[in-house]
Amino acid sequence: MDASGAATMAVLSSLLVFLALSSSLCSAGTLNARPAFPVQSGEIQPSGQNSKQAARRVMHPSFANAGRTPGLEIWRIENFEPVIYPKTNYGKFYTGDSFIVLNTIENKKDKKLSWDVHFWLGLETSTDEAGAAAILTVQLDDLLNGGPVQHREVQDHESQLFLSYFKNGIRYEQGGVGTGFKHVETNAQGETRLFQVKGKRNVRVRQVNLSVSSMNTGDCFILDAGSDIYVYVGSQAKRVEKLKAISAANQIRDQDHNGRARVQIVDDFSTDADKQHFFDVLGSGSADQVPDESTADEDSAFERTDAAAVSLYKVSDASGKLKVDIIGQKPLTQAMLDTRECFILDTGSGIFVWVGKGATQKEKTDAMAKAQEFLRTKKYPAWTQIHRIVEGSESAPFKQYFDTWRDAGMSHSRLIRSALGIGSDELLNDDEIDSVVTQLKKSGGRAFGFMPDHGQNVIETITQYVAKPGSDEIVVSTVPFDEKLPLLGFASYVLTYNYEANNGDTGSLTYVWHGVKASAAARKRAFEEGLVGSKDGLLVQTNQGHEPRHFYKIFKGKLLTSFTALPVTAQLFRIRGTVESDVHASEVAADSSSLASSDAFVLHSGKSHKIYIWNGLGASAFEKQAAVDRFSDYWDDVELEQVEEGAEPDEFWEELNGEGQYDRSLGDDGAPLLESRLFHCHLSSGGFLKVEEVAQYEQEDLDSDDIMLLDAGDEIYLWVGYGVSEEENGKLLDTAKLYFNLEPTARSFDTVSIIRVPQGKEPRVFKRMFPNWDDNYWQNQPSYEDMKQLVIDANNEV
């Protein structure tokens, strides 16, 4: 070993403790909400030249221009040194190597840069190379002044963020600089290789045994025979999988054969002779011997488990000795986090390490070590993800575990723009928006981002579904819209409405509304008929007390929901609203515990012809007046009396079972307003829901073959692609229910609105939650037949 190599090994030995810690840091994967580091495009601002940090900073020459411009940069570790990886090989990773991947993003508005740096470890990489990758990643992070988010990636367990960088997928090749294997030589003849293509949006291409037993009818396979590359399309493979397999084969042709190989596609349209030729080249089997679609259901998905076991631990060295103490379990609140400390959040399927800005250096350094100890104690797999979160840059996946969350200013740009009708090119005034959002969340209705229009049109039809007492027989009747006729809490309703947005966006909208006491049979019948009747329009299911703001708007401020058709005892209604058109009155239990100081209430006496307007100390002047306007002539021959909180007459309390405890807080935090997130959800063959988040999602991530779930907090959008079957479409609610059984927030299936959006019928509010939207996107995408023709054209040029 030369002097340089010996010196390198000495450094590695001295950093053995660091290596032990860094080797356990699993990739974050879903950290798609963080502030950009304040550096202008093309500029890296070093620390002061006299600082101790600057004095100890070391920069490898290969990193000299790293992170200066947007885009992807990759280095392969060779003899413990970072070597720039050719762009033509991006996406190809060797099982015996380690790599460093840097992704630089430029904010389109202020031109500031932010970074994600990943070190990728092949399953056969050496310990020394893995250590060098970890150390060099820290060096690269230091060069960028600590700005990057760091991720550790392990072969077969990469984060969705990492996979998203490689649109043609990533391919695992045997070999490596530090192993006994040899990298495949370009255009090598005689070495036949079989690859399995797994996944759809984010694809992994794995080399498998050269045998028909390695195949199945549900996937696509690539057979690289040197001058010919065959794409075998499984009979059960979907359209997107076919397109991705062709793209992966083209990449193998270009990377491994300098574009000089021919790509041959073998599918259901191929002749029997062409199919058999494929298996002759493979060396075994026939089309009839290909195993059925795999039941392992391993297509690049993760399953959320044990959400109820979420726990928060504090990492402290206040006593001079580092210790970890549990401080809370679900429900968690933001107030539990102390800026002077470090915390570990155990979600049951991953670990977050939250570092407060005022934490000691020892706590910051040792927090990850304690997380590693925690993994061993819990006997979690070695590749379990660990996410390191710094105060102020919390991601949506982290914030979802807390019942309430308040950011300093608004970082939820997609949701806020959608809710308030702010264009993507308009700047946000945080103070003004904070005030509007707070008021909307309290009084303007749930899902205030869902506003297809302003509710100015009339409701077309209202159909009521009521179960006969003592049976599941459903009485269906059409009811007129009348401001004195309430929606009844023991019934379900289907309402139809045609929306017209100011931008010309039009469409049909069907609401399925369930009262809190509606029978299961009534709910089922109403949804089934609403689903059939809505055809290609929007379909929204919502529950009493959790209606979207738009639902209130179509009632023009006259919505009243009641438990009973005719009052026989005292009735208590809560009045909320922000403007005349969204005022709504909701019946609550006639008990003093139902009162809240932040609201106005109307009590209809069961003992006298009197209506009490109760004004809570925190109720807005608008809501107090709205209560008077709404109920002054609602009942005939009644006396109206206004009562201020704290000055109630005895007869008022008698109607409410006596004066008792109630919510006297003047604020209403409500559910956290989280950044919207996109998921692909599907049921496995075993009946389990598989959930795959799409990191930094775009319109192109919506898969026409599937149902995509866009979680926007109070509303869940179920986007239904063109290729979804009638059977799958009929199981929309099952998908949503299972999703809520697994996701960790305090929300439930009954407290959110479920919105079905057919492909091609997306309303403006849905489109605004994407960075960019092109109405002609899918029409301009190449079909499977188009891709096959392009392959033929390319073959003719070889």
Curated annotation (Swiss-Prot):
Actin-binding, Ca-sensitive: annotated span: 451-792
Region of interest called Actin-severing, as start-end residue ranges on this chain: 57-181
GO CC term, one of those recorded: actin filament
Residue runs in coiled coils: none
Location of the region described as Actin-actin interfilament contact point in the Swiss-Prot/TrEMBL record: 128-131
Binding annotation for a 1,2-diacyl-sn-glycero-3-phospho-(1D-myo-inositol-4,5-bisphosphate): 167-174, 193-201
Record key words, sorted: Actin-binding, Calcium, Cytoplasm, Cytoskeleton, Metal-binding, Phosphoprotein, Repeat, Secreted, Signal
Listed InterPro entries: ADF-H/Gelsolin-like_dom_sf, Gelsolin-like_dom, Villin/Gelsolin
Modification sites for Phosphotyrosine: 90, 612, 662
Signal peptide residue numbers: 1-28
Keyword flag Repeat: yes
GO MF annotation terms: actin filament binding; metal ion binding; phosphatidylinositol-4,5-bisphosphate binding
Assembly behavior: Binds to actin and to fibronectin.
Name by which UniProt lists this protein: Gelsolin
Annotated gene: Gel
